[in-house]
Amino acid sequence: MSSGGNDVPKTLPSDTTMRNAVGIAIEQDKPILLDYWLDSLTNACCIGVRESTNEKILVKSSDAYTSCISKILRSGDEYVILTENSIYIVSNKIKPRKIT
């Protein structure tokens, strides 16, 4: 894997978190997505909380966000986040932020 000049930490989700996510993925027939993983390590994404409805979504930008979060499970230093369509693994350092 080339570094490409990125200073992004080369941290991977723990084995325990991956096993937990795989079990849920098999049970609920949902894909596991890691496209928010690196961004969650560098605070480049957040858990957006809509002020009007208290609905939660993962947000990278105004154009990049997930479907509604149905459940957030803590697994060690990570969260396994279930949405309507997918399972995301993010760092537990991810911050909630109010969105409109």
For the regions a protein language model found, what residue spans apply to each?
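N-terminal non-globular leader segments, chiefly Sec-dependent signal peptides
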Residues: 1-78, 84-86, 93-100
